[in-house]
């Protein structure tokens, strides 16, 4: 077997970039026996008998050896079925949870197309969608200075930079960036700058070299390069020695009295350095052309720099030409489209030409689609001679200077009534197809503009209808634009300035599933809220979403922020349930469907097939519309199979109704919002929650047929709370093949439609299943696209009246009338002896009541009704200055009161607690920071440091507050738990491993995985995380199983028909677990993440890492596998050491795998070029496909004395197996001036390990005789080694019995072949010696 056993970093002044791995080969030999004494025994036999036997043995060997050698891997069939199963937090005794689908598709890796939600309960059918407005997906940072007093934080969707009194100037936050061309633009939009730009300080946009890291400040620190373009007109260069040099002062300072946009264009000059080409301030261009000494090749990070006495708010920061807002866009904008207050600002003023556009990829799935835009403001007005509007482009449009360029097709429907066709020839081919086809909307007010496009009989596009504020204008204009050439849908500007709050394409209703048709103003989005305006409508209007309950209870919640019209007497706005056949009616008083209305004014109505009947009036009070209110209705299924209106909650006050209705539970098809003709109200939150067994991905809700085309999927780990419709960007039906997943039992899920993939890259949703209230499966990890990405697990108390929810990018925590002591907590285990927990609260309407604050819990907290239950540990640091400890007996003990002042809730505040480990191994509360003011406490507590399992926000009775940021940090990079958006930077990167599985073969990273154990390591630069994955392919025929274990500890037993694991694990299999493997039992703990900054973690200079508590074997409280499969895998047999993952296989064969902090060759800008893997067939090197590789990697294999064995090159994406030789060897891989050496040597395997390995693949009745034959052959050889006349018999035993099984247990065939050849030579020598003596 092979094993990676150690990791060393050998650096010297001569070779500072060489990182060395050591790979060891375990072969069977005797360490103490001199080579001259290693002879196989043979017995005295007559010459002719020996010769006959030898001939027979030689013939049999020719047949037997090829049979026992594994065959070459066959080609891969990409159309085979595929399934996944996941390990749960509790022992599992039922059948495994299986998602039975075909090959899963490639997932668009942009984080904007995946939504993750982390709160209890799952609501409704989940729609796949694509966000046309992807915005900028923020991560908190890649590198960041460490001298901030208040770290940058999110508030109202803006990143706040606060440097009022930092101990050092020059604080920065920067994101990883490597330009792909010789020009790029950096744009920042600053909405507010209360402090003004204070001179002589220098905030601005900065670029840094890859070596910057997390410095205390960028002033006076050495070892990196920087280039700073300040907001006050200066350009500075930072040398590696730490000195800043001023290069120029060339443009004015923008006024901070108003919001401003600041863009810098950087270009590469002929010397290979950076030129600051142009600065744009609010679209005014200032030509700079300042050449700098900063090498273009050294651009590694782009960031924002703050300085002393500067406070400003950033709503937008992006680098282009990398895609950041759109799919394609024109290139002659003076001001690129940007986000401001939740709207896309289209500013074409000052452009060098009209026809500036921004467009998104779209391919229609039917012969009709609608494009809708809602414009909230148009300061410039629509000029008669211009042509802004909605435009369709062919797929080859790309990024042109303007929409009139040549080489593509376009169809423009302008806002001022004109329709234009653009042929291939560009301007000369633009034809006005129709003028004044409809009136121009007034720009004095917001307006909605919708165009319906249809495919005509000639296969071209017809502009069918234009709607302006819901007024239809029939056009029916046939155009020459081919329907098959629709590739992009976009917005075109012509020297205009306007603000867009909504833009979407829909092949079916675009905001909802069904809605009434007599609106005067269709519902639209404004400032993140759905505006429900029924004024002027001819009847009661509704908007409803497809929903079918899986359980027998559902909760429907709406949060109304404003109700200007009030609820007039006689009106009945409210929450309404519809039957599946409701469709798009003029209003809900028509006949032919069922509905149930729970009105805000206390009335309950039932709509039979012929109309409404009042079932109950004044069932509960009417909420006051003078203030925002939350309204929740709980519906249950009664014994008659009908709907019961169980409870209504108004602002968390419960009103028990238990009112039975005639509406059949089985007829629930849509859930919606209803308004009467005089109503106007604003909705910020609307959702349906329930306990589900699994989840659903829905296709077309009308025809129940799958879409075709590009696949996008919304993936939701369980349990979640899904705010289905509150989205600042539009939710659009995907052009995709999607399955409708239905639940057939609590542990079995099947899909109605297959998902076909043309790629071997996979996406595996993270899924959970529930039986009653008992979680069977909950795995907080998701393999997306090519690799494994961690998702933070969470626990939450269960007595909330209003569960925590998101509103305007903030987490709303409301315990106004709930049971006290509620919490929401995230899994966290510290890897050092210090951690900081920070919360930023933007608003606290209730004031601080009782004991809300930051708390830490032991790992066994789980989902309790409240945190004064028993059985776990807790430590609470309240906002009001008190510190409490909770022992396992449920008693809270106050450790300190009034330890620090209570922050004022009249303003937003930041609250940080520093926890440290004291000499007793317990937690000390070291310091509390309130708005950057430090209060030293040093309060020792009885809470053991090793018991930190969750970090939480605790809420007490009568508290309501809004959280925009919550994070944990142990160094310079915070681990953000609550943030306005969350990007999975690892998804789709070249650092993940692609894998493929069919019934006979498993490929990982283009390498065939043999039966038995294999090890792969990966590195995620953006998250500073090492991913090490163990893969075990089951020995049962036709049932391959991969076990992905990211944790640095695993105890592993190989069984004849399955396996037993005690580890973090994810099971991937074609058929779930092997059918013959009954009573599976797994122990699950959340993944351990190894940080990469600080004094006790990996650095690029080889500092050792001490494994944290999360990397040690599970404690005695963790469930263990059944005794039949765990007898040889106890934690006592495992010893841990720094930098090492340890595996116990069959009790005594140890596999040691180093935690590779940078498991591959890297370029100067940090791009990883290759990785290593090892398994029972050998050592493999895999070259990544990355833009950083421009030439092949050079590989040299040589003996340790320097003699070259082989030299060759490998292209990106190739995997090669290292050829093994007799003796030690080095594999040297180089790229440019960077080199990695991988030495390979031979070690020994002990006899006990061999016996255990043999026993794992044979029944005991055969394994024992085999072991005795193996041992006996060497015993006989030792006893009669001096009698050469009795040659051959020991060799015959070895060839016939021992060699085949050495191959079976994983000894490389090349090694076994060598010993077989040696044995044959000994037989021949024996025969010759016998003849000579005779």
From Swiss-Prot:
Where is the protein situated, by its record's location annotation?
Host membrane
Q: Where is the composition biased (Low complexity)?
A: 1110-1135
Per UniProt, the keywords (alphabetical) are:
Host membrane, Membrane, Transmembrane, Transmembrane helix
What does the record say about its membrane topology?
Multi-pass membrane protein
- Keyword Secreted carried by entry: no
Region Disordered, as annotated, extends over 1107-1135
What are the TM regions of this chain, as residue ranges? 53-73, 1256-1276, 1292-1312, 1313-1333
**GO terms for cellular component:** host cell membrane; membrane
Could you tell me what this protein is called?
A: Putative transmembrane protein ORF1334
The source organism is Acidianus two-tailed virus
